[in-house]
Amino acid sequence: MKRLVILSACLAISLADWAQGNRNDSLRMDSIIHSLPDVMVKGNRPIVKVKGAALTYDLPQLIKNHPVDNAYEAIKQLPGVSEQDEALTLNAQSVTVMIDGKATTMTSEQLYSLLKTIPTSRIANAEVIYSAPARYQVKGQVINLLLKHNTGFHSLQGELFGGYTHQNRNSYTERASLLFTNKKWEIDMLYSFGHGKRYYYYENEFAHTLTDGTSYAFSTHSDNIKRHLNHSIRLGINYHLAKNHQLSFAYTSQLNNTRGTSEDDGDFTSLLRIHAKSQFHNFRLDYSTPFGFSAGAEYTYYNSPDEQWLKSSLYDEIYDITSQQRIDKWHAYLKQEHDLGKDWGLNYGINYTTSRDKSSQENNNKSSDGNTIQNEDQMSFYVGASKSFGQKLTMEASLMEEYYHTPIWNEWNLFPTLSITYLPKAGHVIQFDLDCDRDYPTYWSVKNFTTYNVGGYGKIVGNPTLKPSRDLSLSLTYILHSRYVSSLFFNNSKDEFRQLPYQSDKKKEMEYKHVNFDHVNQVGLMLTAPINIGNWWQNRLTFTGVYQNDKNSHFYDLPFDRSKWFCQAQWNGTFLFGKHVLLNLDASVHTDAIQGIIDIPASGYLNAALTWKPLKDDKFQLKAYCNDIFETGDNHLHDTYRGQHVINKMYFDRIKGLSLTYRYGGYKAKQHEEVDTSRFGK
């Protein structure tokens, strides 16, 4: 799932996000302000190496003096990486995360949940690829997280983690991991349990005028509580037949149960109750050989029933809606890589994915009852080549032909990629990347179903005519002394689809729907510099400037062509008090931004974390933290474009928390006789 987004720490939740819980059919406006990476380097130690199109970062070194508890938080420390709407972006664009070089059919949300269960002690390093060659089996930007593999050692080690968070209500996280290795086998097990409550408050203001001149003006304030129980499980087994000859199996499961209530008061009253469940199971089998051939298969099962009950005085009506989505998805691949000598490489392969989506909805007012079954097939063939010209210049290019078939779309598309890397001298890297891609809507967003929020005034509707987007990305990255990173980028997305509100001119209702833009264009520059003062104060300064143009010539009766310059500045400071205590401060401020007809006001935040590591080997860690200390990072939406009037102000308390991490176990002597061998939602 690839979305063109701008830099953002701004819009994490919108009105309809509450109405649908964790559903993607809720109003989740794409975030606007890019929250930039935390890059911290001690002294002049290199943190990045170049291999072909990949920049390999010493991620354990980057997170050494940061209050990072899991792989997801660790990835956010990479240059150019940010988090928006609980998703990762790289240089203002969405990014695919892989584990040990293996693509997956899991959705981004499911993969992020898995990353949050992986302890940082398992991380070896991370590869950043701005234009992934086709041999990676994914398109666009890629972060490849590489884990530690210790086959050849007898080892038993693990980690226990407990976390407490308070944001007006309490939430808890418990996590356990275990890794066992011997001569041939590697077995890792992860389990995480999250539970608790979340509270937030928002204010709404609406002014609505119909074509007959009738006007309405009303405002509400809302109290919202969510309760969640989330289980995440992973079992991974690697069997090494010989050097670089491996058979691996992985099972991942996520079970989520959410209940919530939302009470509106003001010019009208309403009560919304939601109960959403989901279960996800993923099975994967991979086989790799020492002569460059690899194959694999994967099956994913996803089932998500939910219920919504809404009673409102606005229309004196009760809405009782039951929805369900089941997805079965299969994926298989074959690929081959050759070393042709004289620094030439050749690769080619085939991928096939098929899925079956069965969705249904029952509505007491019969407005959107229905059952749908949609089959989707996707097959791609690719060929790629790489060449090194001496020690300073490398180039890699690939071409993928993809066939995509649904009941609506039946298309062939070509996707070229190109990456050129030049090393003028030690510690200096210049890299140019070109990437073409196509982004497809989620299953649920194209269903002709309806749900409600804001006392029934807001309707979240599907769009069966939604088209895939066509994306082009160019970037030029310069790394100085293996520490200072700058990136100039251009992103163009034709038929980009985003969800926007619209106040009808025919009746008193507001509609939220994914619509296709003509285009979304971005030109931006990111600069990141670590600055150390002695051995006790480490800093990182980041600045990003972006010009964005959003155009939609067919958005109801409100066509728009809007442009905006905006920027963000961020400072991250780490103060070292001896060898065992460190204090982290993270401050950010951004200017006004836009998204379609939405205006996003300026805001900022200050976070602090105090970490105590009493043992030399960091086996024990205690962390206390407070995010958004001054409560200035609240999310607000303003839509006053050409007669529309929607003001949403969402308020959150500062987040306070404690976490405890304990690592146990270690390595035993290596066996010298053996060779040391080593990756949906609605």
What kind of feature is each model-predicted range?
Residues R438-S487, N492-K494, Y512-V523, N532, ...:
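Outer-membrane beta-barrel signature, preferentially recognizing the C-terminal barrel domain
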Residues T104-S131:
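Short acidic/polar hinge/loop motifs at secondary-structure boundaries
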Residues L27-R28, D38, A71-A74, L111-S113, ...:
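N-terminal periplasmic accessory domains that precede
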Residues R169-K197, G213-T261, Q279-F283, T289, ...:
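Transmembrane beta-barrel wall of Gram-negative outer-membrane proteins
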Residues Q20-N22, P614-K682:
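C-terminal beta-signal and adjacent terminal beta-strands/loops
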